[in-house]
Amino acid sequence: MNANVSKLLNEQINKEFYSAYLYLDFANYYASVGLDGFENWYRVQAQEERDHAMLFYQYLQNNGEGVTFEAIAKPEWERDDHMTPLKKALAHERLITAGIDAIYAAAYDVRDFRTMQMLDWFIKEQGEEEKNAADLITKMELFGGDSKGLYMLNSELEARVYTAPSMTCLLYTSPSPRDA
């Protein structure tokens, strides 16, 4: 694997773990203000992000690449209202998308088709992530100012359940340098 592609994939692992950390912080905030549905939404989101990190980890391992773990930064944000985490989440998802796009571009430059194929799943996933974050902002803008609307939105978010991702492209690996 190209050294730059491997480096970018390693960096993405850290970004995904940071995402999980950030979303757990959002979940903690919402739990502290009694919005259990919002807490559930972001707790599930944190699980997804952790799994995304593990998918990148497994892809690197399957391809004989080393994995380097960096420190996870403390999330910094103002806990001033219920909308702040929602807007911060959308901005963050856009940053994650940009990171995945950068890996794809680097893989394209060196004709690393296997990595490009693996990233196709993440590109689609990021489209979903950004849409979900934007939709949540829209719903909060529509209903969040009304206590009944906020209650209904909170109840809707409480119903979200975690589903682990599955990526069959991780089953296909190149020979490990250890096998050479």
Predicted regions and their residues:
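Acidic/His metal-coordination segments adjacent to aromatic residues that form catalytic metal sites
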Residues: 1-6, 71-91
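Acidic interhelical loop/turn segments
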Residues: 2, 31, 98-124, 138-151
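A structural feature that tracks compact, well-ordered secondary-structure segments
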Residues: 8-12, 20-24, 97-101
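Generic structural signal for well-ordered, non-transmembrane alpha-helical segments
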Residues: 14-17, 43, 47-54, 87, ...
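Conserved alpha-helical segments that form or flank metal/cofactor-binding pockets of metalloenzymes
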Residues: 30-71, 133-136
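Short, flexible active-site-proximal loops enriched in glycine and acidic residues
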Residues: 62-72, 99-101, 110-112
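Short terminal interaction segments
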Residues: 143-171
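Single conserved hydrophobic/aromatic residue that forms the stacking wall/gate
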Residues: 172-180
